[in-house]
Regions:
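Conserved structural motif at the start of ABC-family nucleotide-binding domains
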Residues: 12-14, 27
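ABC-type ATPase nucleotide-binding domains, specifically the catalytic core motifs of the NBD
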Residues: 22, 78, 103-122, 130-132, ...
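The feature captures the beta-strand-to-loop junction immediately N-terminal to the Walker
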Residues: 43-45
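Helix-to-loop junction immediately C-terminal to a conserved catalytic motif
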Residues: 58
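Conserved ABC transporter NBD signature motif
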Residues: 66-73, 86, 119-124
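Conserved ABC ATPase signature
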Residues: 141-145, 149
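ABC ATPase C-loop
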Residues: 158-159
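Short, glycine/charged-rich "phosphate-handling" switch motifs in NTP-dependent
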Residues: 213, 225
């Protein structure tokens, strides 16, 4: 299967990116693209390199080689805070909310780059559309929320900077199964407003259900890509990830 569009036209274009930690290669020449206004899933087993790719895109780690372009500009060597200002938000694995702060304060901390108060208020309302329970919990401390609600808060906080691209690392990890569809409904709401989503997920079935396009990573390499629904029916996915 071919990519949905050319590297030059993509909102995000990753080309031949390699990352190593202490001499051990985590990524071995990854190339992928994400079109504007889409959900793109990165699936694969533990150690496949999915998180390393997000860390490279967000400026947390520097690639050994390769190029990362975003909205037409080379961002490969930019610092993490500059990448946020360019319009990329990264919600890492593990929720990482500020437990002693209220839901409202957690959300507003995500909007630290936005000085326009009316813009912050609009983004709060957008967050409540995606995750209505957050409105009801607005003045509660984050520590009082369930694990699923904390994940909703972490994702919503990621949207508060008004990103063009929202990167989510394992949003369903450790979440009660009954709350996972609610989290993914919120992710789809975010994408429907025009924010592109790059989704790392071990829950392959759920990721491919909501994604437009998907890449399969194994040992730091892309081994398959394609339309998410078509990929879900492929023998590779069925045998390797769905147990079919």
């Amino acid at each position: 299967m071919t990519q949905p569009q050319t590297q030059t036209a993509a909102l995000l274009a990753v080309e031949d990116v390699a990352v190593a930690y202490d001499g051990m290669r985590a990524l071995q020449g990854v190339t992928l693209a994400a079109a504007a206004g889409t959900i793109v899933a990165l699936v694969g087993a533990n150690g496949a390199g999915k998180t390393s790719l997000l860390r490279a895109i967000s400026g947390i780690v520097r690639p050994e080689r390769g190029t990362i372009r975003f909205a037409g500009s080379d961002v490969t060597r930019l610092a993490a805070h500059e990448i946020v200002r360019r319009g990329i938000a990264h919600v890492p694995e593990g929720r990482r909310v500020f437990a002693s702060a209220t839901v409202r304060d957690n959300l507003l901390l995500g909007a630290y780059v936005e000085r326009d108060r009316s813009a912050r208020e609009r983004r709060l309302e957008d967050a409540f559309v995606a995750f209505p329970i957050l409105r009801a919990r607005l003045e509660q401390r984050a520590s009082t929320l369930s694990g699923g609600e904390q994940q909703m808060l972490a994702i919503a906080r990621g949207t508060m900077s008004g990103p063009k691209l929202l990167m989510l690392d394992e949003p369903s990890l450790g979440i009660a199964p009954k709350l996972i569809p609610e989290i993914y409904d919120g992710i789809q709401q975010i994408a429907a407003r025009g924010t592109s989503v790059l989704l790392v997920e071990q829950n392959v079935r759920e990721a491919l259900r909501v994604a437009d396009w998907a890449y399969v990573l194994q040992t730091g390499r892309v081994v398959a890509s394609g339309d998410a629904r078509e990929l879900a029916e492929s023998e590779l996915i069925k045998k390797a990830f769905l147990g079919l």
